Amino acid sequence: MEKKIVKDILFLSQVSQPASQDDLYLARDLQDTLLANRDTCVGLAANMIGVQKRVIIFNLGLVPMVMFNPVLLSSEGSYETEEGCLSLVGVRPTRRYETIRVAYRDSKWQEQTITLTGFPAQICQHELDHLEGRII
């Protein structure tokens, strides 16, 4: 179900709690909300729809990638860029990594690891920041 985007900075500044299998429904809510905002959005974290759980979604080709309890394992090739966010007005400067490796659980609650480069890596890092309460 599509959810309203949270813009409360105090709420977004809180560190999200680990997700459990009881939170699998968030994948559908995040996917519906991402689809509804596809013209201006390429990724979401659960706190952006009002749930303080460690769940993110971002565009990765034809099918959005959903990650439960993602953990950044490694990164390389830092660079400066600017990003926007549905929860904020305008764009802001930030530092990202060209290549990252992330461990997570998928929608079947299986442990996975993925290496991302370029724009998908940038989007994933932005959403990981949301889970830590970091706002660009």
Predicted regions and their residues:
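Positively charged
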Residues: 1-136
